[in-house]
Amino acid sequence: MYDAPHQFEPLLPAPAQQEALLAKAHDLARSATQLAGLPVAGELRGLLRGMNSYYTNRIEGQHTRPLEIEQALARNFSANKELAARQRLAIAHIDAEAAIELRYSGESGGRQLYAAAAVRDIHRELFSRLPPEDLVTSEGEPVVPGELRQREVQVGRHVAPAHASLPVLLERWGQFYGDIRRGEAALLALAAAHQRLGWVHPFIDGNGCVMRLPKR
């Protein structure tokens, strides 16, 4: 079983593979600068929160349609208990994303995101918004907001690292990616950090949502 930082390296694609990826990152950054300073950027941010909630929960098997999300935002929840739970998760995701944007703003905030404390904070920010009846996995196991998993897990064919090694793995993850904060390399590091955090699988539930919530 994985239990040491060197076992989840390399943390970036091989140099020979980076050229094409950096070119794509350059094109993305150039397109994004066209929105900088425009009022539309703020409007898009609000729209994207709803879109992000829709897609991340669909990926996680907690699908809600856009109309159902709009109804939940108006506190008009379904009489169906399962759908109502999905609606609560959808609006919790939207509200958590807004809070995270404020808390981790600016250059210093972007660096702070690459830390074990921030990873736990994001999990807590999302799941603390849910009522106790929603804080249970499909297997009936309790979900504690912000708590790293306390047992071993396997997701499909992937056996996640030993739970006792999570602090040291997250420390290495943060040290490495937090130092890459400039230009196209930062975008490449963002994608790699997303994948590696999923490999670590720090929580008993909600890992995908936590990985996708910060987009810095």
PLM regions and their residue ranges:
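FIC/Doc superfamily catalytic core
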Residues: 1-216
